[in-house]
Amino acid sequence: MKKVIVYSQEGCSYCSELKNLLEQNGVPFTVTDIDEKKSDWEVISESSGVEYVPQVLMVDTNDESGRILAPDRDFDEVSECLQHIMTDLQE
């Protein structure tokens, strides 16, 4: 099983759009506010090489392996990010 964690920031329209798309498609996810969890955000942004949101961490709960989806690196549009998430969840 895979867990979806959205790294988000208040006032980010792209973050809101992604969360709405996930809800509309019935994808369970948790949100980590980067202003509240700065140390978590530092690890994610350093790992991805991208310092802005939204970013998504896909964690395989069976072996704790993970994949980060970052804007401009893995997707240009929020809908493209949703496609990556849906594909990952089916694997």
Please describe what each predicted stretch is.
Residues Y14, E46-E51, P71-V78:
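Noncatalytic linker/hinge segments flanking ATPase motor cores
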Residues G11, I34-K37, D74:
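Short beta->alpha junction loops/turns
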Residues M58-E91:
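Non-catalytic, surface beta->alpha helical segment in thiol-disulfide oxidoreductase systems
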Residues T30-T32:
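General small-molecule cofactor/ligand-binding pocket signal
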Residues I34-Y52, N62, H84-L89:
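Thioredoxin-like thiol-disulfide oxidoreductase module
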